[in-house]
Amino acid sequence: MRYADIQVETERLRLRPFEMGDAEDWFKIMSSPEVTRYWSHLPWQSLQEAQEDIIQDITHMERKEYLRLAVIDKATNALMGMCVFFNHYPNSRRGEIGYCLDTAYQGRGIMKEAMVAFITYLQTHLSVRRLEADIHPDNKASATLLMKLGFEQEGYLKQRWIVGDEISDSIIFGLLLPSKVE
């Protein structure tokens, strides 16, 4: 299956590839200092960054280099965030996940719902047996989400990221599948 054709649905959400029409909403999300506080880049400064990101995304997805899906509210069709699967090693059946959510939607269980569906998709359609996540040590909400999904803390890497003027560490979480994710 082409990554561009993937659709994953839950009761409240639709996960689908990004489209150029998402650029303004994607910029709004990724220009937020709150959303990007623990991200691997500074907040975006222009709509062009969102447009270029979506174009790059389409190219990478066509090559199956990673899988990034927009998280859409089925009731309003609003872009709420995204889930991504990257650094995929098919022979080892493992890869990394990431996610972000607009602050307007945080604290409602939305990302947990999205990630359960996303991880189930990865396990079912890509035969993934191991997932990893790399988070900032201060990102307590993300650590809580990962633990609710069954991930375990596996390591701590010092001075892993430089974003702007800040050098930060990383906590590494891992999940062995076929554990059922709920």
Per-region residue spans from a language model:
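A generic secondary-structure signal
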Residues: 56-60, 121
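A short hydrophobic/aromatic micro-motif that marks alpha-helical segments and, especially, helix-coil
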Residues: 46-48, 61, 180
